[in-house]
A protein has these predicted regions:
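Transmembrane beta-strands of outer-membrane beta-barrel pores
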Residues: 20, 37-43, 152-154, 163-167, ...
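Membrane-embedded beta-strand positions of outer-membrane beta-barrel proteins
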Residues: 16, 33-35, 159, 261-263, ...
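Outer-envelope beta-barrel architecture signal
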Residues: 27-33, 142, 153-155, 233, ...
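Outer-membrane beta-barrel "beta-signal"
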Residues: 13-16, 301-313
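Repeated loop/turn-to-beta-strand initiation elements of outer-membrane beta-barrel proteins
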Residues: 23-25, 154-158, 249-250
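Extracytoplasmic gating/loop element in the C-terminal half of outer-membrane beta-barrel translocons
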Residues: 165-260, 265
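Transmembrane beta-barrel architecture of outer-membrane proteins
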Residues: 6-12, 37-43, 139-144, 163-165, ...
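Conserved small-residue
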Residues: 2-8, 12, 21-136, 178, ...
Length: 313
């Protein structure tokens, strides 16, 4: 290992908080709020890669986290459309070299961006990337959180939300939670709505293509593309705590200073565009494509609910 690259990172962090109280129905009502926001971008400013080949990890001007991939213009509606496509794009072997019978109805329709009649990676450099382009970035465009709470008449409530702005993730071929039988023919996990989500002549507007085993581990789905690149931004209801402290006069006769009954919930709900395409991958556990081990079958954040009582003597 060597320190062979120069990196420039620019970003910001913001934090705002407010706490106050006023009288409500003759009793003090206290409330508080806190919000945080941060963002950063990192670029390579110096690296020994004069041709800017993708064969090396970095190149000058590279933004860390950029995702290069192919553009997909939907699925072929008929075998005839697929045949017409292959008469215009003559060499599709980089994409469909392992597909028996070539492109058929229900397969992905890749766009020949450079118009040379060949679907591929060109010279595999930034200047000649073939039919690839930057589709997104794997690092969050921003990270934020906010807390809201109040206390009144012995009740106290606090809620914490946490989330990120847009960032993107392409599922690894071994991620059966996302791909199901597109990973392996002997897959042990099949989504309950799989039949409704995959292409067939009766379901031409499906999100997933015609079923082909191993297409995510070596076929057309293994090529990073715009159709299955996932925006994994999210907003998570991270914590809710509701408590009630018994009035002191109730406790005087039993020699107890304080009794508080409470409920705490963790990871109660989340909002994310990923839910539209897959209910079985948690956006917070969707790592970058290079983290193969974490990409395969990551556990989701568990929802927990707990009731308790605090007694102070």
């Amino acid at each position: 290992k060597a320190n062979s690259a120069d990196l420039r990172t620019k970003g910001y962090e913001l934090s705002l908080s407010w706490r106050d109280q006023f009288t409500l129905a003759g009793h003090p009502f206290g409330y508080h709020a806190r919000a945080t926001l941060s963002d950063f971008r990192s670029h390579i400013t110096k690296f020994d890669n004069p041709t800017r080949t993708f064969g090396k990890s970095y190149y000058e001007g590279m933004r860390i986290g950029d995702i290069w991939g192919f553009v997909v213009d939907g699925l072929f509606a008929t075998d005839e459309e697929a045949k017409q496509y292959t008469s215009e794009v003559l060499d599709c072997s980089y994409i469909n070299g392992r597909m028996t019978g070539g492109f058929l109805a229900g397969d992905l329709k890749f766009v020949d961006l450079d118009g040379d009649g060949v679907l591929g990676i060109g010279s595999n450099t930034v200047d000649k990337p073939g039919d690839r382009k930057i589709l997104g970035n794997s690092l969050p465009s921003m990270q934020y959180g906010f807390t809201l709470g109040f206390d009144w008449l012995g009740f106290d409530v606090s809620a914490f939300f946490q989330g990120t702005g847009s960032h993107y993730w392409y599922p690894h071929g071994f991620n059966m939670n996302f791909w199901g039988c597109y990973s392996y023919s002997y897959v042990s996990f099949l989504q309950r709505d799989f039949i409704q989500r995959c292409w067939s002549e009766e379901n031409p507007d499906a999100y997933f293509p015609r079923p082909r085993s191993y297409s995510a581990t070596g076929g057309e789905l293994s090529k990073v593309n715009s159709m299955y690149l996932q925006n994994v931004r999210y907003l998570r209801f991270k914590n809710l705590t509701v408590g009630y402290t018994l009035p002191k006069r109730w406790l005087d006769k039993v020699n107890v200073d304080k009794v508080r009954i409470y409920f705490t919930g963790e990871n109660l709900y989340y909002w994310s565009p990923l839910k539209k395409n897959c209910l079985y991958v948690d956006p917070e556990s969707a790592f970058s494509r290079s983290s193969d081990v974490n990409n395969h079958m990551s556990y989701t954040w568990q929802k927990t609910m707990m009731f308790g009582i605090d007694i102070t003597f």
